[in-house]
Amino acid sequence: MSALRRKFGDDYQVVTTSSSGSGLQPQGPGQDPQQQLVPKKKRQRFVDKNGRCNVQHGNLGSETSRYLSDLFTTLVDLKWRWNLFIFILTYTVAWLFMASMWWVIAYTRGDLNKAHVGNYTPCVANVYNFPSAFLFFIETEATIGYGYRYITDKCPEGIILFLFQSILGSIVDAFLIGCMFIKMSQPKKRAETLMFSEHAVISMRDGKLTLMFRVGNLRNSHMVSAQIRCKLLKSRQTPEGEFLPLDQLELDVGFSTGADQLFLVSPLTICHVIDAKSPFYDLSQRSMQTEQFEIVVILEGIVETTGMTCQARTSYTEDEVLWGHRFFPVISLEEGFFKVDYSQFHATFEVPTPPYSVKEQEEMLLMSSPLIAPAITNSKERHNSVECLDGLDDITTKLPSKLQKITGREDFPKKLLRMSSTTSEKAYSLGDLPMKLQRISSVPGNSEEKLVSKTTKMLSDPMSQSVADLPPKLQKMAGGAARMEGNLPAKLRKMNSDRFT
């Protein structure tokens, strides 16, 4: 046991599967030691609750030079303490360097020794040492302009250095101040006022098992073109043996219906319907205790005040998905406005929810349905079956009456009577019946008794049927056939009568 704990960590516990229980239970001293041991190790988050991704890039080697090619983005991505350090260090070095250049010019011209001579014109007036040169640079760079130190026209090198100082100072100011401004106005801070519920829930909604979580906007300013996406991160192994530690699957949160486009004025509940296309098709309350997955939620939109794109992220592990729960309502109608109570934003309550997966529910629904004969959905198969029945009728009508009774044609009405009387057989469709019965049953006003009586007459001895029992059209055809028979010669009429006798 100690070896297992060293391997899997302190989160390891011995669990057993029980056929009558609801899931996995810790193994007690009185239980069977032969039962299966399933180590349960806590999953390492890929995305924290605050949206930070737990990814560290290592062993880059020579690829680190790519960061210098995009120096501005590199500085913006640094933490604030490093930004402030670089900001102060850059200005300090630039000031000391330029002050040293002014001191070097004064030293090479001999202004430091001749500054107090009455008729001598120095390069920079009143610069006697390095501190005075540093103060002159600060007055020039910051455009303070006290007027006590100034450049004279007897120093061309000072004029060139002054131009270089102005250009370099403008570049440094634009780079560092721009970097600080971009970092302060980053839309990451806008994401701090976008809330996600602490837990996701699974319960029934509109008769379907649904995964739900809640999002909210704390500010009065809106998120323009807000869109939400969900990713399922789960490790799996391909049939070829390749192991994928972070396989990403898309969760449908309303792409086809447009429900992923949010009007985020008040808290909204995001829904993912679990169906045959969902990765959670096999997920049940019991299997959640052994599954390991992470649901990453990404909310994107444009900040109304700045026009910059903002993205907020969070994630839910299998331990943060509550089965059989529902969110408390947070919106109430007040006098002339709607009030949102954020104290109930994360609150949930239990609701009756089947503990089975959608796949298991569909299988149980099929098992509980009455046994029905397989319907012939193919038109070709239905046509062939009708032809077989017609051929069987032709064969039996040619037999003598005694053989017709032996073939069991009298038993057909009883079977049809049982089919029409039992309630469990009401699932039969008209496509499962012969074409003759379909035409009879499709006539309005034909009840089950009439259908059985007509079926009995149709399946009885055809020689006993009279013309009066036939429909009007068939009666006309039969009458026309009789008239045609009367017009035949005597020899043909005799042959026709001999054929039927």
UniProtKB/Swiss-Prot annotation:
InterPro entries: Ig_E-set, IRK_C, K_chnl_inward-rec_Kir, K_chnl_inward-rec_Kir3.1, K_chnl_inward-rec_Kir_cyto, Kir_TM. The chain crosses the membrane at residues 81-105, 158-179. Pfam families: IRK, IRK_C. Residues 18-38 have a biased composition (Low complexity). GO terms for cellular component: external side of plasma membrane; I(KACh) inward rectifier potassium channel complex; parallel fiber to Purkinje cell synapse; plasma membrane; presynaptic membrane; T-tubule; voltage-gated potassium channel complex. Residues 106-129, 149-157 are extracellular. Heteromultimer composed of KCNJ3/GIRK1 and KCNJ5/GIRK4 is activated by phosphatidylinositol 4,5 biphosphate (PtdIns(4,5)P2). It is a multi-pass membrane protein. SUPFAM superfamilies: E set domains, Voltage-gated potassium channels. Residues 182-209 are annotated as: Polyphosphoinositide (PIP2)-binding. The record marks 173 as: Role in the control of polyamine-mediated channel gating and in the blocking by intracellular magnesium. It catalyses: K(+)(in) = K(+)(out). Residues 130-141, 142-148 dip into the membrane without crossing it. Its main location: membrane. A motif (Selectivity filter) lies at residues 143-148. Belongs to the inward rectifier-type potassium channel (TC 1.A.2.1) family. KCNJ3 subfamily. Inward rectifier potassium channels are characterized by a greater tendency to allow potassium to flow into the cell rather than out of it. Their voltage dependence is regulated by the concentration of extracellular potassium; as external potassium is raised, the voltage range of the channel opening shifts to more positive voltages. The inward rectification is mainly due to the blockage of outward current by internal magnesium. This potassium channel is controlled by G proteins. This receptor plays a crucial role in regulating the heartbeat. This is G protein-activated inward rectifier potassium channel 1.
